[in-house]
Amino acid sequence: LIHQLSGLLKSDSGTIHFDGNEISQLSAPKRCDAGMVRSYQITSIFRDFSVLDNVAMSIQAREGHSFRFWRNADNDRSLSNKAMKVLNETNLQDKAGVLADNLAHGEQRQLEVAMALATSPKMLLLDEPMAGMGPEESSRVTQFLNSMKGSYTMLLIEHDMDAVFALADRITVLVYGKAIACGKPEEIRNNSEVRNAYLGDG
């Protein structure tokens, strides 16, 4: 689903509308330019660069700079200030100088979200952000994403049902690619078909 929304996979039928416009024929980069930004199930960060520089590169990409000529945030006060603003927003300010590869898995997911937010998205598509996490780490990332809800529109694909019910205002449940239910969290929680498929009551 996220592949189709983000333009990486062409739909067989139907249309996709975003921000009042029909975007079904737009390429993935054009959809990104329109404000639809995604994270991936497998963490996608620059592991050999600092947390600050990861966010700085996203800012430069948003501003149209080539990565061949990217500027080091430590040598550019304006760029560093912009990147630090994003890190403060995502509670990563204390990790600014840490290599991305040295972060805990949950912190790497936070960094990936920070990189997405640095592009000033209108909608953030999150593809299984809790993938590979234990309960404690998943809970921390859920709290982090919950703190973002008031500022950003997010569409979340996730199999961690605790995270789904903690984060979502509206839930659509897919089974083998078919939508079997759509509604508010309590409506979904009480849906017998959903309970049989996902909540362990079948």
List the model feature ranges, each with a label.
Residues 1-202:
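Glycine-rich phosphate-binding loops of nucleotide-dependent enzymes
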